[in-house]
Design a protein with these regions (language model features):
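Hydrophobic alpha-helical transmembrane segments of multi-pass integral membrane proteins
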Residues: 1-468
Length: 468
C-alpha cells in the first residue's frame, strides 16, 4: 500500500505564478493545491461519480413526485432516490473533498491514495446497486450493494483515521472530521439493519423509529457536522474573510454532536414522557448547533473583503437559508408526531434538497473550477493567454441554475405540504433543469483546454460582469 509523502510542518512558499496579477483567485485559493495533496484523479473520480448520482437523483424526483406529495416516505421508490442524494451526491462529494482538503486544513496528506481508489471502486458501484435495488425491491442488488458500500466506507474510515493520527494541531476541523466519521459508521450500521428489515421484517413496529434515527444521524451527524468543519476553513478562504470571530464553529459542533446522540436515544427509547423529554432536549441542542453554524457563516460573510458574491457563494448562502427553514420547521414536526407524513416529508425535503444539496453545489462551484485551472493552465502562465478561474464557467448560467434549483425546491415543498401532485412534479422538473445546467457548467470546466474553448462558450462580458 503506497503512502503519500508527509506535508512539511512549515507552510510552503507560494509558487512564482501566484504573484502574477492575471488571475486573483488562484492566489486566494492556492492552499487547495499545496504540497501533499493527492493527484487530481482521486478527488476527480469522486466528483464525477457524485455528479452522475445528482443527475439520477434529480430525475428520480420527477418520478417519485406523486409519492412525495402523498407523504409516502416509506415507499421503496422514495428510499432509492433519497440514497442517490445522501450516499451518491453528498457523501461522494465529501469523500473527494476530504482527500483534497486534509493537507490544506490539517497539514497531513492522505495515508494511502491507493486505498482511496479502492474505496471509490467499491463505494460508487455499491451505492448505484443499493439505490437501484431498494427502488426496485431487489434483495440481491441490495445485498451486493450494501456489501460494496461496507468495503468502501471501511477503507475510507481507516485511511482517514490513519491520516488523522499524524495531526499535531488537533483543532475544530480535526474534531469535526472525527465526529462526522463516527456518525458515518453509525449511519451505515443502522442502514444495514433497515436493509435487512426489508426482507425479514424483524424490526416490526420499530421500523419508522429506526428510520427516523438513521436519517437524522446521517444528515445531521455525518453530513452537517462535516460541512460545519470544512466550512470553517473554506468559507474564510473563498470570502477572504480572515479576522472574523471563529468561536461559533466549536459551539456548533459541540451542540450538534450532543444533540444528535441525545435525539437518537430519545427516538429509540419507549418510556413515554421520559422518552419525549429526551427527544426534545436533543432537538433543542441540534437547533442551537444549527443557529451557531448560521451565526458563524454570517460572520464570515460579513467580514469578507470582496463586496460582491460570486455564483458559488450565492448558492451556498441560499442553501443556508433552506437549512434555517428546515430547522425552524423541526419543532413543529416533532410536536405533530408521525401521523403528519406530508409535514415530515416537507421538513426533510427543505433540509436535504434545498439546504445541504444546494450548499454543496456552491462549494463545488468553488473547488472544481480551481482544481481544473491548476491542472490545465498553471504551467502556461506567462507563456500564452489563459483564462481566469472565474472564466471557466458562465456566471449567468450559474445564476439561472440557482434560480431554478431554489424555486424548484421551494415549489416541491409547497406541493408536498398541500398534497398537490402536479405542483410537486412541475417543481421537480425545475430542480432537474437546474441540475442539468449545473452539470453542463462543470462539464465545460472539465473539458476546457484553452482560452479559446472558454471564449467560444462564454457570455457577453458586460452581462457576466454583473454576476461577478
Amino acid at each position: 500500500m503506497s503512502t503519500a509523502p508527509p506535508v512539511p510542518s512549515v507552510a510552503p512558499r507560494p509558487p512564482a505564478w501566484s504573484a502574477r496579477p492575471v488571475s486573483p483567485r488562484p492566489v486566494a485559493m492556492a492552499g487547495l493545491a499545496m504540497e501533499g495533496t493527492p493527484s487530481l484523479r482521486l478527488p476527480g473520480e469522486h466528483f464525477a461519480a457524485a455528479l452522475l448520482f445528482l443527475i439520477a437523483g434529480s430525475l428520480g424526483l420527477i418520478w417519485i413526485a406523486p409519492e412525495l406529495a402523498a407523504g409516502l416516505y416509506l415507499s421503496p421508490h422514495v428510499a432509492g432516490v433519497t440514497h442517490c442524494f445522501t450516499l451518491g451526491w453528498l457523501s461522494m462529494t465529501i469523500f473527494g473533498a476530504m482527500y483534497q482538503l486534509l493537507p490544506v486544513a490539517l497539514g497531513v496528506s492522505i495515508h494511502s491514495e491507493r486505498a482511496g481508489h479502492v474505496s471509490f471502486c467499491a463505494f460508487a458501484p455499491g451505492v448505484a446497486l443499493f439505490a437501484f435495488g431498494v427502488a426496485s425491491s431487489s434483495e440481491a442488488l441490495r445485498n451486493i450493494g450494501i456489501t460494496l458500500i461496507a468495503i468502501g466506507v471501511t477503507c475510507l474510515v481507516i485511511n482517514v483515521a490513519l491520516s488523522l493520527r499524524k495531526v499535531a494541531d488537533r483543532d475544530v476541523i480535526w474534531g469535526a472530521i472525527v465526529i462526522a466519521l463516527s456518525f458515518l459508521t453509525l449511519t451505515f450500521v443502522m442502514g444495514a439493519l433497515l436493509a435487512r428489515n426489508i426482507h425479514s421484517g424483524f424490526l416490526g413496529g420499530w421500523r419508522v423509529t429506526v428510520l427516523a434515527t438513521h436519517l437524522h444521524v446521517a444528515l445531521l451527524g455525518w453530513v452537517l457536522v462535516m460541512i460545519v468543519g470544512i466550512s470553517h476553513r473554506l468559507l474564510p478562504m473563498f470570502l477572504l474573510a480572515h479576522g472574523a470571530d471563529t468561536r461559533w464553529t466549536s459551539r456548533a459542533l459541540a451542540s450538534l454532536a450532543a444533540g444528535v446522540v441525545i435525539l437518537a436515544i430519545g427516538l429509540i427509547t419507549t418510556h413515554g414522557a421520559a422518552s419525549g423529554m429526551i427527544t426534545w432536549v436533543g432537538l433543542l441542542l441540534i437547533e442551537c448547533g444549527v443557529v451557531c453554524f448560521l451565526i458563524q457563516a454570517g460572520l464570515f460573510f460579513r467580514a469578507r473583503k470582496r463586496p460582491r458574491l460570486d455564483a458559488g457563494l450565492r448558492h451556498a448562502a441560499t442553501g443556508l437559508f433552506f437549512i434555517a427553514a428546515s430547522a425552524a420547521l423541526a419543532p413543529l414536526v416533532l410536536a405533530s408526531g408521525p401521523e403528519h407524513r406530508q409535514l415530515d416529508t416537507t421538513y426533510v425535503l427543505l433540509g436535504l434538497l434545498g439546504g445541504l444539496t444546494l450548499y454543496v453545489i456552491g462549494q463545488f462551484y468553488k473547488i472544481v473550477p480551481f482544481l481544473a485551472w491548476m491542472a490545465r493552465f498553471r504551467n502556461e502562465m506567462g507563456k500564452k493567454r489563459v483564462p481566469t478561474v472565474a472564466q471557466l464557467y458562465s456566471p449567468l448560467v450559474a445564476h439561472i441554475d440557482l434560480a431554478l434549483f431554489a424555486a424548484g425546491s421551494l415549489g416541491m415543498a409547497m406541493g408536498v405540504i398541500t398534497g398537490i401532485s402536479l405542483l410537486t412534479r412541475i417543481a421537480a422538473m425545475l430542480v432537474a433543469s437546474g441540475v442539468a445546467l449545473f452539470v453542463s457548467q462543470i462539464a465545460r470546466v472539465a473539458l476546457a483546454t484553452s482560452f479559446r474553448d472558454i471564449g467560444a462558450a462564454g457570455v457577453q462580458p458586460q452581462i457576466a460582469k454583473t454576476f461577478e
